[in-house]
């Protein structure tokens, strides 16, 4: 199977450091697969759904906010009290981050 090179961040957001780590793992360490993994009941996604503002977390959550706005099927209870809404936002967020990684990385 091989080794796992892991770069973790709340809300599985992308940034220059995370993308740089992915590029290192592929180009230098020889990784052949990158997985962006969201999870149920993600606190960062819930924070974005609730429009939380708290210190440096605010900037991180702002990267998840587009997924909140992109989710159009849940018209009521668009907050963390609605587990269906949170799950849909989490899925959209993963897809958005995969797209951003592909767009931003030349490797």
Name every feature range the model reports, one short phrase each.
Residues 8, 35-39:
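Short beta-strand segments
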Residues 4-6:
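Conserved beta-strand scaffold positions in the cores of enzyme catalytic domains, especially
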Residues 2, 11-32, 43-107:
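Divalent-metal-activated hydrolytic enzyme cores
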């Amino acid at each position: 199977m091989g080794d796992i090179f892991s770069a973790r961040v709340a809300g599985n957001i992308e940034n220059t450091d995370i993308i740089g780590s992915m590029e290192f793992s592929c180009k230098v360490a020889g990784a052949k697969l990158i997985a962006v993994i969201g999870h149920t009941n993600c606190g960062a996604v819930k924070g974005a759904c609730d429009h939380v503002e708290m210190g440096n977390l605010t900037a991180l959550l702002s990267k998840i906010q587009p997924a909140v706005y992109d989710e159009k099927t849940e018209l009521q209870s668009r907050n963390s009290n609605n587990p269906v809404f949170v799950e849909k936002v989490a899925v959209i967020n993963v897809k958005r981050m995969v797209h951003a990684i592909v767009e931003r990385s030349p490797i």
